Amino acid sequence: MVGEIVESAVLSSVLVLVGLAIGFLLLKVQGE
């Protein structure tokens, strides 16, 4: 169904955003 496709797309994009945020925070911590 279309709903499942949208749901999985939202989940994957959220996971990517979380991964980027964690990587950014780790880089900031290492920079200091």
From Swiss-Prot:
TM helices/strands, residue ranges: 9-27
Can you say what this protein is called? Cytochrome b6-f complex subunit 7
Gene Ontology BP term (one): photosynthesis
Species this chain originates from: Pyropia yezoensis (Susabi-nori)
User: Quick one: which gene encodes this?
Assistant: petM
InterPro entries assigned to the protein according to its UniProt record, in alphabetical order: PetM_cyt_b6/f_cplx_su7
Q: What keywords are annotated for this sequence in UniProt?
A: Chloroplast, Electron transport, Membrane, Photosynthesis, Plastid, Thylakoid, Transmembrane, Transmembrane helix, Transport
Per the record, a Pfam family? PetM
Under Gene Ontology molecular function, one entry of this record is: electron transfer activity
The listed locations are: Plastid, Chloroplast thylakoid membrane
Q: Which GO terms describe its cellular component?
A: chloroplast thylakoid membrane; cytochrome b6f complex
Source domain of life is: Eukaryota
The record describes its quaternary structure and partners as:
The 4 large subunits of the cytochrome b6-f complex are cytochrome b6, subunit IV (17 kDa polypeptide, PetD), cytochrome f and the Rieske protein, while the 4 small subunits are PetG, PetL, PetM and PetN. The complex functions as a dimer.
> Does Heme show up as a keyword for this record?
no
